[in-house]
């Protein structure tokens, strides 16, 4: 499922590239894990609004078409996941045709309608504070390559990352157990359900998960 990176530069992770800036200030060694800290008040607010966990978070939004997994497969995946854990459905609110920041209100609503009766908690994320707080409540995160994926890694969450046309070695989750999936076409429309379900199962127990390098 995983294709080779396009260029030599793309084989170096962005964290490692950024870390080299510190050499000018005497910073040496290897970069550690990313860290971001959720707002305690926002976390408490979310805990009051949603059911008790544990949760698997599924974030569905992506800017580029090649990074969007089809609605039907998200719904199938969520239906299967909800048999073992409650699923927190996350998305960027707004309209898909917004040229500046495509949103997924309609897609999220259709997924909720399709999986009616499953243990799904929809949580729209209108800002970074809400997104970070919601991700912090999850045991595992399934999402396309993008900002939510990197925030999940910075929160120390095991991640199943769905990659389309971006370089894996440069942008994969950093410093956490993860699985990366990408079809040969580099378009998530061609990624079947089965390998995603299998990857989620592999990360069921974070202590047993392996890093993909």
Please place each PLM-identified region on the residue numbering.
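Catalytic machinery of carbohydrate-active enzymes
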Residues: 1-213
């Amino acid at each position: 499922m995983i294709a080779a990176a396009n260029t030599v530069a793309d084989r170096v992770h962005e964290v490692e590239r950024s870390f080299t800036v510190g050499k000018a200030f005497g910073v040496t060694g290897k970069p550690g894990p990313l860290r971001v800290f959720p707002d305690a008040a926002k976390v408490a607010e979310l805990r009051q609004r949603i059911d008790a966990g544990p949760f698997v978070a599924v974030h569905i939004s992506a800017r580029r078409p090649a990074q969007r997994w089809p609605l039907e497969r998200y719904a199938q995946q969520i239906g299967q996941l909800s048999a073992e854990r409650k699923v927190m459905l996350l998305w960027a609110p707004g309209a898909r045709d917004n040229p500046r920041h495509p949103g997924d209100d309609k897609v999220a609503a259709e997924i909720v309608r399709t999986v009616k009766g499953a243990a799904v908690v929809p949580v729209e994320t209108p800002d970074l504070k809400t997104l970070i707080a919601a991700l912090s409540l999850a045991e595992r995160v399934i999402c396309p390559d993008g900002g939510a994926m990197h925030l999940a890694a910075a929160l120390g969450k095991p991640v199943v990352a769905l990659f389309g046309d971006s370089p894996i070695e440069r942008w994969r989750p950093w410093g956490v157990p993860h699985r990366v999936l990408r079809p040969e076409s580099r378009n998530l429309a061609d990624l079947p359900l089965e390998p995603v379900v299998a990857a989620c199962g592999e990360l069921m127990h974070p202590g047993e998960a392996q890093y993909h390098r």
